[in-house]
Swiss-Prot record:
Organism: Doryteuthis pealeii
Protein keywords: Cytoplasm, Lipid-binding, Membrane, Phosphoprotein, Transport
Protein name as catalogued: Sodium/calcium exchanger regulatory protein 1
Function: Binds and may transport fatty acids such as palmitoleate. Also binds poly-phosphoinositides including phosphatidylinositol 4-phosphate (PtdIns(4)P), phosphatidylinositol 4,5-bisphosphate (PtdIns(4,5)P2) and phosphatidylinositol 3,4,5-trisphosphate (PtdIns(3,4,5)P3), and phosphatidic acid. When phosphorylated, stimulates the activity of optic nerve Na(+)/Ca(2+) exchanger.
Subunit field text: Interacts with Na(+)/Ca(2+) exchanger NCXSQ1; ReP1-NCXSQ phosphorylation does not affect the interaction.
Location of this chain's protein in the cell: Cytoplasm; Membrane
Location (main, coarse): cytoplasm
Tree of life domain: Eukaryota
UniProt GO cellular component terms: cytoplasm; membrane
């Protein structure tokens, strides 16, 4: 269930992240820094109210939102977008409207958080392990 996402997570593996960042327009210098980072995500859930704090050694971003309600989001790379989140089965889906549109999903499978990032025909998979 989506509530299993609550907690603190650290990146364990990443596939196709550089291609995803290129597809959303991230410049080379920022891509190099992001590829070298090992982010943590701290997810808090209170009913339909969620917050996600993503931290690296060079940047921290916080988003707070209510499931089903559109909100303004500034992404880690500085893009300003409109986002709506929803629950789909055991996953929390972020539908990001900007230039370009993208979809991020988070779901716990086998005790790990699987984060799938999609833009156009590019798919990135990032696996996080729970931090005790």
């Amino acid at each position: 269930m989506a509530a299993d996402l609550a907690g603190k997570w650290i990146l364990e593996s990443s596939e196709n992240f550089d291609d995803y960042m290129k597809a959303v327009g991230v410049g080379m210098v920022m891509r190099k820094m992001a590829n070298a980072a090992t982010p943590t995500q701290e997810i808090k859930i209170d009913g339909d109210s969620w917050s996600i704090k993503t931290s690296t050694t060079f940047k921290t971003t916080d988003i707070s939102f209510t499931i089903g309600q559109e909100f303004d989001e500034t992404t880690g790379d500085g893009r300003k977008i409109k986002t709506t989140c929803k629950i789909d089965g055991n996953a929390m889906i972020q539908d990001q409207k900007g230039s370009p549109d993208s979809i991020l999903s988070r779901e716990v499978k086998d005790g790990k958080m699987h984060m799938i990032l999609k833009v156009n025909d590019v798919v990135c998979t990032r696996i996080y392990k729970r931090v005790d």
